[in-house]
Amino acid sequence: MALPFQLGFQDATSPIMEELLHFHDHTLMIVFMISSLVLYLISSMLTTRLTHTSTMDAQEVETIWTILPAIILITIALPSLRILYMMDEINNPSMTIKTMGHQWYWSYEYTDYSELCFDSYMIPTSDLKSGGLRLLEVDNRVVIPMEMTVRMLISSEDVLHSWAVPSLGLKTDAIPGRLNQTTLLSTRPGLYYGQCSEICGSNHSFMPIVLEMVTLNCFEKWSTSML
């Protein structure tokens, strides 16, 4: 989860988020190198007194500044396309969970179980227990087995919402009349927090998401107790 004064991303909990972090560092390094070169050229032009007035054209320079940006764009585009395909690829999910956005709460349905469904509301600050996180705790967490591929089907009953969990690298729009899907895979147990990331009305800020990643045995016990 996010911490006060945090400057970087949240710790990655899924292979997709790890790839996104690597891509961010890769792109940031390219931006840093370009910025350093531009600053060096600007400082050189401001500090040197030497001028070159006899050159009417410079084909070599023009060739370089045409080819070099193309190479840079390719080095950014290829890993980006790879991650996009990874995010869209869903192969043999172990479980499917349907998520519906409402004003202003989420409802979940485990489609592999006949009657396992519930609504998830934010716990008001006045009802928080000791150690609870303000505006992030919910009355019903989404319990998911770790190290298993889970397909999330996401839609909305009323207006546009967006189901987002940063530590898993997930952000999928919930659109009325349309069913979007994404996949998640957690590499370790724990609680992972997210929020609605699309302005959806006056209580938009009060639609938290809490995923509880547990072992398969714990999930089976929980699902049995909920049925």
From Swiss-Prot:
It catalyses: 4 Fe(II)-[cytochrome c] + O2 + 8 H(+)(in) = 4 Fe(III)-[cytochrome c] + 2 H2O + 4 H(+)(out). Its cofactor is Cu cation. The chain crosses the membrane at residues 15-45, 60-87. It is found in: Mitochondrion inner membrane. Residues 46-59 are mitochondrial matrix. One of its GO terms (molecular function) is cytochrome-c oxidase activity. It is an enzyme of class 7 (translocase). Its EC number is 7.1.1.9. One of its GO terms (biological process) is ATP synthesis coupled electron transport. Cu cation A1 binds at residues 161, 196, 200, 207. Mg(2+) binds at residue 198. It is a multi-pass membrane protein. GO terms for cellular component: mitochondrial inner membrane; respiratory chain complex IV. Cu cation A2 binds at residues 196, 198, 200, 204. Belongs to the cytochrome c oxidase subunit 2 family. Component of the cytochrome c oxidase (complex IV, CIV), a multisubunit enzyme composed of 14 subunits. The complex is composed of a catalytic core of 3 subunits MT-CO1, MT-CO2 and MT-CO3, encoded in the mitochondrial DNA, and 11 supernumerary subunits COX4I, COX5A, COX5B, COX6A, COX6B, COX6C, COX7A, COX7B, COX7C, COX8 and NDUFA4, which are encoded in the nuclear genome. Component of the cytochrome c oxidase, the last enzyme in the mitochondrial electron transport chain which drives oxidative phosphorylation. The respiratory chain contains 3 multisubunit complexes succinate dehydrogenase (complex II, CII), ubiquinol-cytochrome c oxidoreductase (cytochrome b-c1 complex, complex III, CIII) and cytochrome c oxidase (complex IV, CIV), that cooperate to transfer electrons derived from NADH and succinate to molecular oxygen, creating an electrochemical gradient over the inner membrane that drives transmembrane transport and the ATP synthase. This is Cytochrome c oxidase subunit 2. It comes from Phyllostomus hastatus (Greater spear-nosed bat). The gene is MT-CO2.
